[in-house]
Amino acid sequence: MSPPTVKLNSGYDMPLVGFGLWKVNNDTCADQVYEAIKAGYRLFDGACDYGNEVEAGQGVARAIKEGIVKRSDLFIVSKLWNSFHDGERVEPIARKQLSDWGIDYFDLYIVHFPVSLKYVDPEVRYPPGWENAEGKVELGKATIQETWTAMESLVDKGLARSIGISNFSAQLLLDLLRYARIRPATLQIEHHPYLTQERLVTFAQREGIAVTAYSSFGPLSFLELSVKQAEGAPPLFEHPVIKDIAEKHGKTPAQVLLRWATQRGIAVIPKSNNPARLLQNLDVVGFDLEDGELKAISDLDKGLRFNDPPNYGLPITIF
């Protein structure tokens, strides 16, 4: 079972359903990636600050060695962390990440957040985070244009086939499009029924930029991080609207939430260490929701954002 794809403006095909590596434990990551490949997953969404790229690469290498897939069958995504936004820092960290994965190119390399932090040498702290080695948050001076120019050079050198952005507002995206030599192929955003961001999604898609949703299950991913906004939000899996639609179609609430996105052309990157749920999450294009059902889910929008630096006690305002 392999998911359908969406054609990127770079000319490459990106799977509509992938496996997200955020919060995948190091001791299980290699096996989870390997099992996901066996189940039919081809897109893996990583980032250097997830701290598990070496292990993810081990899972990929095992699957390739056993002949389950070729490298060309996979779509591997990673991200540029905020402390490497200076133009001269982009290529070195991308090369390190490629080495960690054990591959020679990324299918998609993304600017993780539209904010520059002061450089921290990977020898001092890696994986990186919002705070430096002294526990302080220090803003950098790199502009998005400087960073994007360096991202474009990764495409020129064959280190990334496509480049994209994440957590950008419509205003920042509009500005980026004014000077980009290579347009962003994708925009990755927090997107679930409590935060639909419909105008941003419409704008990106109108500009030929594919949208990928993260945290498709809303507050679920953030409960263990003690995000207060998540603790006070009703779980989407238990919401009557979602449960009723799932029961009608003979699907799980998770499948309904993922189909709500994919039916609107938005890619999703859920994760699971449960073999049955792995297959269920992949099987989210074999049924269609009615227009009224899509609207009922979208009407749950509260403008409720969970992945926001201030929610973690960080003194940075992005959104």
From Swiss-Prot:
Gene Ontology MF terms: aldose reductase (NADPH) activity; D-xylose reductase (NADPH) activity
Binding locations of substrate: 112
Enzyme class: oxidoreductase
Keyword terms of this UniProt record: Carbohydrate metabolism, NAD, NADP, Oxidoreductase, Xylose metabolism
Binding positions for NAD(+) per the UniProt entry: 166-167, 215-224, 271-281
Enzyme Commission no: 1.1.1.307
Reaction(s) this enzyme catalyzes, per UniProt: xylitol + NAD(+) = D-xylose + NADH + H(+); xylitol + NADP(+) = D-xylose + NADPH + H(+)
Gene Ontology, cellular component aspect: cytosol; extracellular region
Gene3D superfamilies with a match to the protein in the record: NADP-dependent oxidoreductase domain
Site (Lowers pKa of active site Tyr): 79
GO biological process, alphabetically ordered: D-xylose catabolic process
Signal peptide: none
Active site: 50
Pathway: Carbohydrate metabolism; D-xylose degradation
Biological role stated in the UniProt entry: Catalyzes the initial reaction in the xylose utilization pathway by reducing D-xylose into xylitol. Xylose is a major component of hemicelluloses such as xylan. Most fungi utilize D-xylose via three enzymatic reactions, xylose reductase (XR), xylitol dehydrogenase (XDH), and xylulokinase, to form xylulose 5-phosphate, which enters pentose phosphate pathway.
Recorded family membership: Belongs to the aldo/keto reductase family.
Protein name, as recorded: Probable NAD(P)H-dependent D-xylose reductase xyl1
